[in-house]
Amino acid sequence: VWLFYGNQYLYRLQYNQGSQGVTTSYRIDPNGNVVARPKEYNITRFTTYGIFGEYIITCSSVDTDTQDAEGNIAKGLGLNYLHVQNETTRSATVAGGGENFLGNGEYVTFAGILEANGKLYTAVIPMGLSKYGVKAENGKYVKYPDLVKTEDGGSGSGAYEKGELQGTQYPDEAWVAIYPDDTFTNPTLVRSDRISYACGRNRSQYYQTIWAADNGDVYVFSPSYAKIQSDERQQTKLPSGVARIRAGAAEFDAAYHFDIEAASGGQPLFRCWHITDDYFLLQMYNQGLNARGEGATKMAVFRGESKTFKYVTGLPDPDVISSFGSYPYNESGAAYIGVVTTDGSQPAIYRIDPSTAVATRGLTVNAGSVSAVGKLKSVE
């Protein structure tokens, strides 16, 4: 993952399945050269990340030291804090995180780190019941006993163990945790029953889909990934949609909801980003929902207050787009994003005007792909 910290530094967050990865960062020197900074970070596995103050924070579900009488291990939430200026790192575990975080017995992970209104917002993603959660309080949290796994199976991010219940039993709701600071203590938990949980998915990665408008209103976007669960009891009935938390509020705006699928011709979003004001850039599926990000080759612009949705015009045909950059660069009210195609053309940077939803081709990139777009200024 390539992540720009403003216009000062570029981070290469190294993700390795199940183990540590070496993370490096870069700057521009006074001569215009990209140079690596001295410090390398060994950070543990992460499934989401974001910026809060002076830190880049990564997070994932982890095993803790807590066990029940049968040796079943409780889940927790593991954090890595990378202090950008000091080039130091530390790890922590979320207090009270993981097991029974929402009061329904399920363990959770987070999707995204959003700094807004002087607080830290993150989407809470319910993961189902661990073996520890299945056994907790004599099984009181198991709604559907036949969903408890009877043998080990799956692979990669879909692997499971005998005795756990994979996937949430509560697919028709979304939760956001609001923390007063980056210590991840004393959260305010807010719930909506108008959208399903809020995150983009690509295998084990959980992409941020909660973003603040310039006025501090937090918009919560849901692709409704629970639709693709194999058991209908774990499938959400809710379409891909948008909910809102007003700036400074401790609850969802009961009067606000937008049905993305009704406006898009039946397609959900994959992931999204804030551009400017209350404009958001949405990467849209055009071949139906999946948890691998495949077939998400359209872009749309959504304006929060007016609830307007427009597909972006001026991009290459969706059938020849193979990928977009992992996030846009915003400047002067426009979004810039890399586009890679399969028609033999070189990758290019496109400028998207949110007020018109029109894309214009800009720089051609002499490379095979474009991971991210940003701008760096010289840092001593």
Regions found by a protein language model. Give the residues of each.
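Post-signal peptide N-terminal segment of secreted/secretory-pathway proteins
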Residues: 1-106
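Repeated scaffold domains used in trafficking and secretory/extracellular systems
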Residues: 1-3, 41-54, 102-113, 199-210, ...
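Short beta-strand elements that form the blades of beta-propeller/WD-repeat-like
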Residues: 6-17, 53-71, 118-127, 159-168, ...
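Beta-propeller blade signature
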Residues: 24-27, 74-87, 136-185, 234-250, ...
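Beta-propeller fold detector
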Residues: 33-43, 86-103, 186-196, 252-262, ...
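Beta-propeller domains
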Residues: 170-177, 182-252, 258-260, 264-268
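Intrinsically disordered, low-complexity segments enriched in Gly and acidic/Ser/Thr residues
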Residues: 253-345
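Hydrophobic, glycine-enriched assembly/anchoring segments
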Residues: 323-326, 330, 339-380
